[in-house]
Regions:
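Secondary-structure capping and boundary motifs in well-ordered enzyme cores
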Residues: 157-165, 169, 186-197, 215, ...
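Short, solvent-exposed loop/turn and secondary-structure capping segments
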Residues: 27, 235, 307-310, 332-336, ...
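Contiguous, non-catalytic segments that form substrate-binding/exosite surfaces or channel walls
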Residues: 4-7, 14-19, 23, 184-282, ...
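Active-site-adjacent "gating/activation" loops or surface patches in catalytic cores
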Residues: 71-78, 88, 98-118, 124, ...
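Active-site recognition of the HExxH zinc-binding catalytic motif
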Residues: 212, 297, 314-337
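Noncatalytic, helix-rich "gating/capping" subdomain that lines the substrate-entry/channel surface
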Residues: 1-192, 196
Length: 363
C-alpha cells in the first residue's frame, strides 16, 4: 500500500480491531460523558503516574511540555464503588462506563508496536485528508461523509479552503469578518436584548413554586453574574509567530497545530483569561460556558434571519431572543446547574430542590 505495508489489508484489519477494542472497553457513551460529576477528576502528578500501567507516561508528559505540571483534570476515570454510591449511579449507568484512561494505557502496552505505528499513520492521514492529494480526501469523504452520514457530495473546494484556513488562522479571518459585517450598533442592541431576557428569566425563577428561597437566591446570583460576550473578543489573535509557507499546506497545518499547543501550554499556572472565546466571530452558533458562567454570541449569528439592527423588536426577540434564552437555560439545565455563579463545580441546591428538579426533568 501507499503507506509502505506489504499486507495493507491485513494491517488495516489489525488497526480496526484495535479501535474496536477502544470502543468496546475504553470509551464511555456520550450520555455518560455529559455527567460532570463523573468527568471531573482532579489528580496530582503522582496519581496520574499510577494510571500508566507500564506506559511511558512521564516521557510523554515531558515531550508535551507538561512535565512540571502538578495537577491534572482527567475526564475518564471510572468511579470507585464508594464514589458510584455517593453519586447514586445504578447498574445500568455503570454498565455504560468504559475503562477510560487506565484501560487505554493497558491496551497500548499490550498492542504490538507495529500496530500502534499503523494506527498513528492512519490518524495522520485521516486528520490531514483535506490537505493531502485528492485521492486521500475523496476516500476520507466517501467513508465519513457518504457512508456514515449520507452526504452525497463534498462542499465546493472554495468552502473547504476557507474551513482549512479558519482551522489554522481562525481569529485572523474573524478580524476581517467583523470589520466588514459587524458594526458597533449591533453590539449595543444585543446588550439591551440580553438585559431584557435576563429580567424575564429572573421573573420566571421567582415564580417557581417548588423551589425554596435559599436555592432561588443562589439561582438569582448566578443569573446576575452571567457574563454576556457579544460579537467578538477585543484582542483577536494575529499569530505573529506562526510561519506560513505558500504551497505547503501540510507543513502549515503542522505549524499551526504546534503553535496552538504551545499557546495552550503557556497558559498553565496563569490566571484564567476571561476574555478568551471558544468560538470564532464568523461561526453561526452560540454557547454557554459553565466554568466561566458566560453566554457567548459570535458576530455571525447576529445577522439575518436571527437579528437585524433595523428589524422590528418582535422579529429580533423571536429570532436571536430565542437563542439568548436557550443559552441562558443551559446555565440551569441538568449539567449547567451543577456550577455556581463563579463557575465552580458546587452543589448550591437544597437536597429537596434538587430531587424536585431531577424528577421534573425525568418526567
Amino acid at each position: 500500500g501507499e503507506a509502505g505495508y506489504a499486507d495493507a489489508a491485513g494491517m488495516a484489519q489489525k488497526v480496526y480491531d484495535f479501535e474496536d477494542t477502544i470502543a468496546r472497553t475504553v470509551s464511555w457513551d456520550r450520555a455518560t460523558r455529559r455527567n460532570r460529576d463523573l468527568t471531573y477528576t482532579a489528580l496530582t502528578h503522582a496519581q496520574v503516574d499510577e494510571l500508566a500501567n507500564g506506559f511511558p507516561l512521564e516521557t510523554m508528559l515531558q515531550k508535551m511540555g507538561l512535565g512540571q505540571t502538578d495537577r491534572f483534570i482527567v475526564s475518564d476515570i471510572p468511579p470507585s464503588a464508594e464514589r458510584a454510591a455517593e453519586l447514586g449511579l445504578d447498574e445500568a449507568t455503570l454498565a455504560k462506563i468504559g475503562g477510560g484512561t487506565p484501560a487505554m494505557t493497558t491496551l497500548i502496552m499490550n498492542t504490538p508496536v507495529e500496530v500502534l505505528q499503523a494506527w498513528t499513520t492512519k490518524e495522520m492521514l485521516e486528520n490531514n485528508a483535506a490537505i493531502l492529494p485528492k485521492r486521500f480526501d475523496d476516500a476520507d469523504f466517501a467513508f465519513y461523509g457518504t457512508l456514515l452520514q449520507g452526504t452525497p457530495e463534498q462542499r465546493p473546494r472554495w468552502k473547504r479552503s476557507i474551513a482549512a484556513t479558519e482551522g489554522m488562522l481562525g481569529e485572523l479571518v474573524g478580524k476581517s469578518y467583523v470589520e466588514r459585517y459587524f458594526p458597533a450598533e449591533n453590539k449595543a442592541a444585543m446588550i439591551d436584548l440580553v438585559s431584557n431576557l435576563r429580567k424575564a428569566l429572573a421573573e420566571s425563577i421567582d415564580e417557581i413554586d417548588w423551589m425554596s428561597d435559599a436555592t432561588k437566591r443562589e439561582a438569582m446570583a448566578k443569573l446576575d453574574s452571567f457574563d454576556p460576550k457579544i460579537g467578538y473578543r477585543d484582542n483577536l489573535e494575529t499569530y505573529p509567530d506562526l510561519a506560513i509557507t505558500a504551497g505547503n499546506p501540510v507543513a502549515n497545518s503542522m505549524a499551526a497545530a504546534e503553535w496552538g499547543w504551545q499557546d495552550m501550554v503557556s497558559k498553565l499556572g496563569q490566571p484564567i483569561d476571561r476574555t478568551e472565546w471558544f468560538m470564532l466571530p464568523q461561526t453561526v452558533n452560540a454557547y454557554y460556558n459553565s466554568t466561566k458562567n458566560e453566554i457567548v454570541f459570535p458576530a455571525a449569528i447576529l445577522q439575518q434571519p436571527f437579528f437585524g439592527i433595523s428589524a422590528d423588536d418582535a422579529v429580533n426577540y423571536g429570532g436571536i431572543g430565542a437563542v439568548i434564552g436557550h443559552e441562558m437555560g443551559h446555565g440551569f439545565d441538568d449539567q449547567g446547574s451543577k456550577s455556581d455563579a463563579t463557575g465552580m463545580l458546587r452543589n448550591w441546591w437544597t437536597d429537596a430542590d434538587r430531587q424536585a428538579f431531577d424528577k421534573l426533568g425525568n418526567a
